Structure formats: C-alpha cells, structure tokens
Swiss-Prot record:
GO terms for biological process: cell wall organization; peptidoglycan biosynthetic process; regulation of cell shape; response to antibiotic. Its EC number is 3.6.1.27. The gene is uppP. GO terms for molecular function: undecaprenyl-diphosphatase activity. It comes from Escherichia coli O127:H6 (strain E2348/69 / EPEC). GO terms for cellular component: plasma membrane. It is an enzyme of class 3 (hydrolase). This is Undecaprenyl-diphosphatase. It is a multi-pass membrane protein. The chain crosses the membrane at residues 6-26, 45-65, 90-110, 116-136, 190-210, 222-242, 252-272. Keywords: Antibiotic resistance, Cell inner membrane, Cell membrane, Cell shape, Cell wall biogenesis/degradation, Hydrolase, Membrane, Peptidoglycan synthesis, Transmembrane, Transmembrane helix. PANTHER family: UNDECAPRENYL-DIPHOSPHATASE (PTHR30622:SF3). NCBIfam families: PRK00281.1-1, PRK00281.1-2, PRK00281.1-4, undec_PP_bacA. Catalyzes the dephosphorylation of undecaprenyl diphosphate (UPP). Confers resistance to bacitracin. Belongs to the UppP family.
Length: 273
C-alpha cells in the first residue's frame, strides 16, 4: 500500500468515524462496511480504529470542557440523596452511576463481547437499535421530567447506564442506547444527548485504553503518519458532527436516524452476504 493511498484511506475512515461515533447510527456498522470496501481489514485496521476513536473523544472534551471540569470540581462527599432531592446540578455521581452497569458487564464478559464482532451480529444490532429509537420516540413522556442536564436524578443516570449495556452488542450504538434510555426515563431529547456525550468520555477512554494496550504490538513506526491523519480527521469531523447534531435534534425526532440504521443494516447484508 503506497503512502498516499494509506493516507487517503486514513482520511476516509477518519471522516466515517468522526461522523458516526456520537450519532445514534452505529460507527461500528459504518466502519466494517467502509473498511471492507477499501480492503483495510485485519489487526492493523483494528488498532487504527482504536486510535482514531481517541480523536472523536478529544472532540467531546473540547466541546464540553467547561462542563467536564465543572463536574470534576464539584464536591460530592455527602451521602446520596433520595430520589428527587438531587435535582439542581449535574454531578460526577451521575456520570459514575451511568458508567457502573456497562463497566461491570464489560469487564466480566469482555472476551464474549469481542467474539460477537462480526457482520451478522452488527446487522441485527443495527435493526434492534433502530427499533429502540422508534420506541423511545413513541413511548417517551409528553413532558420530560428532566428538560435539562441539571434536572436529572441519580435514578435516571443509573437507568441510562443500564441501557448503555445494550451497546456492548457490537453495532448497537452507545449513543443510540443511552439517548433512547434517557428519553424513556423522562429526560428530554437534548439533555439525553448531552449526557450521552459526557458519559462517552470516561467510557470510551477506558475501553479504548484497554483495546490499545492489547493491540499495541500491531502498531509500527511506519503506521504513525496514517494513524495521525485518521486521528486528526476524526477529531475535526466529530467536532462538526456534534455541533450539527445538537442543533438538529431541536427540530427533528430520531425516527430518521432509525430508518437510516435499517438502510445501513441492509447495506451490511448486501456487502457481506
């Protein structure tokens, strides 16, 4: 593979990663299709995907740095309040409660989850995740109980974390699972999306660090330019995607995203079967 060819592939995959990582459409589904069509598969490709995810994570940190640093600075040493008594400020406890279910299941079943990473499972996950988005739009309360991030309760944060466990199924979409869960729990579409982004930082950093540690041996110095291009591209595109997405969901529902997931599932079937 020539240098220019590899850099072009890196840029294309960086765009795909940046566009899809935080939208409820499954970055995994898109990456396996595009990677297959480009002929970029195998251990190096998996390591590359792990590295460029860091670019997407950095975009969230840049977008929400005030909120993230504010969370770190909040004192939360007092005991947990009862349901309904903790409204008024999003705290680090909300993030921790949102992390616990997926972290526990992810550590317990890491190898099993990795074994699910194949086109057929991704295709089914795309469909089921799309159905969940439709269900969330149809079944959500008419008036959200938590219109803003600072209105969320600990219970809502924990239940969103439980929904996040669905994203351990490759192709389901972490953002799709958490946003749908938030809406079903009475969090507004916009606030659920913001919480999903904030929750992504520790979750994705932890998962990416673990994957990078396990796949570090496949990275060579010759890969650095390609990985750098993918990282930077994913970062820039993710910044644009997040800003656009947060504006878009003020005006439209998630039904179009669900339909798009069904189309991607069909594309997976056509490409691989």
């Amino acid at each position: 593979m020539s240098d220019m060819h590899s850099l072009l592939i890196a840029a294309i995959l960086g765009v795909v990663e940046g566009l899809t990582e935080f939208l409820p459409v499954s970055s995994t589904g898109h990456m396996i299709i595009v990677g297959h069509l480009l002929g970029f598969e195998g251990d190096t490709a998996k390591t590359f995907e792990v590295v460029i995810q860091l670019g997407s994570i950095l975009a969230v940190v840049v977008m929400f740095w005030r909120r993230l640093f504010g969370l770190i600075g909040i004192h939360f040493g007092r005991p947990l309040q009862h349901e309904g008594e903790n409204k008024g400020r999003l705290t680090l406890i909300h993030i921790l409660l949102g992390m616990i279910p997926a972290v526990v299941l992810g550590l317990l079943f890491h190898d099993t989850i990795k074994s699910l990473f194949n086109p057929i499972n991704v295709m089914y996950a795309l469909v089921v995740g799309g159905l969940l988005l439709i269900a969330a739009e149809c079944l959500k309360p008419k008036e959200p109980r938590a219109p803003g991030l600072d209105d969320m309760t600990y219970r809502q944060a924990f239940m969103i974390g439980c929904f996040q466990c669905l994203a351990l199924w490759p192709g389901f979409s972490r953002s799709g699972a958490t946003i749908s869960g938030g809406m079903l729990m009475g969090v507004s579409r916009y606030a659920a999306s913001e919480f999903s982004f904030l929750l992504a930082v520790p979750m994705m950093m932890g998962a990416t660090a673990l994957d990078l540690y396990k796949s570090w041996g496949f990275l060579t110095t010759g890969d650095i330019p390609m990985f750098a291009v993918g990282f930077i591209t994913a970062f820039v595109v993710a910044l644009i995607a997040i800003k656009t997405f947060l504006q878009l969901i003020k005006r439209i529902s998630f039904i179009p995203f669900a339909i798009y997931r069904f189309i991607v599932a069909a594309a997976v079937y056509v490409v691989f079967f």
